[in-house]
């Protein structure tokens, strides 16, 4: 009887700990762009059973990023998303010290450790659509492009935009203004104004704030 009771018993196990997911943002979720969409995803994960999330926003690219990523790794986060290209070196540096933590880096190309992965989107497809629209609505045949940094992701977008525009309107001129920032509303607005002053009547932007649209 004792054996039967033992065999039929259900052994209680401790509840599984929640998976902790961290996000490092280069700007604020209120940018209505890149960081905003990442944070929508974070909120969706937070709503799932068995997950908790943390977001650190307005983290500069550089030594501060190392500190922020380390903070998440030290506080028990199992998966960390570093959501800006400029976090690439910091991500790989910290990942080497925390082999049990998984790291996902946005739009990068260096995966120095087995626990580092990269992700991106086919953003150039949207740029093709923008180029088509620009070619068909411009009156001045001058269009502008506000670009953040000269990295592969951004250059792919410029090429897609420009090639599609010229395909439908060979007389179009494309002027590019580099702002060397992802999120700086003042710089983005100034770039848009400069393009307008030079005759552009259609402007695309690969930056994070809506400032160019508010000119």
PLM segments and residue spans:
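Boundary of Sec targeting at the N-terminus
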Residues: 16-18
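An alpha-beta-alpha
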Residues: 42, 127-176
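Extracytoplasmic "Venus flytrap"
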Residues: 22-48, 54-65, 85, 150-156
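Ligand/cofactor pocket segment of small-molecule handling proteins
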Residues: 164-215
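Flexible loop/hinge segments that line or gate small-molecule binding clefts
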Residues: 96-120
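Structural motif
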Residues: 53-73, 180-195
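C-terminal segment of classical bacterial N-terminal signal peptides
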Residues: 4-14
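Periplasmic-binding protein-like
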Residues: 76-84, 104-106, 198-209
């Amino acid at each position: 009887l004792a054996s039967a009771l033992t065999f039929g018993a259900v052994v209680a196990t401790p509840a599984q700990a929640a998976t902790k997911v961290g996000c490092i943002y280069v700007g604020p979720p209120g940018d209505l762009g890149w960081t905003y969409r990442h944070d929508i995803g974070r909120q969706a994960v937070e709503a799932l059973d068995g997950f908790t999330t943390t977001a650190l926003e307005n983290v500069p690219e550089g030594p501060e990023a190392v500190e922020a990523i380390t903070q998440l790794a030290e506080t028990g986060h199992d998966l960390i998303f570093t959501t800006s290209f400029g976090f690439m070196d910091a991500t790989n540096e910290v990942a080497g010290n925390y082999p049990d933590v998984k790291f996902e880096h946005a739009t990068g190309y260096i995966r120095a450790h087995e626990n580092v992965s990269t992700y991106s989107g086919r953003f150039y497809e949207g740029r093709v659509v923008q180029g088509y629209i620009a070619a068909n609505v411009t009156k001045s045949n001058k269009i502008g492009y506000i670009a953040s940094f000269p990295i592969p992701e951004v250059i792919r977008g410029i090429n897609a935009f420009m090639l599609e525009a010229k395909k439908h309107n060979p007389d179009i001129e494309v002027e590019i203004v580099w702002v060397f920032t992802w999120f700086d509303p003042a710089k983005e607005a100034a770039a848009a104004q400069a393009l307008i002053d030079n005759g552009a009547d259609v402007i695309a932007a690969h930056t994070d704030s809506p400032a160019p649209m508010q000119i």
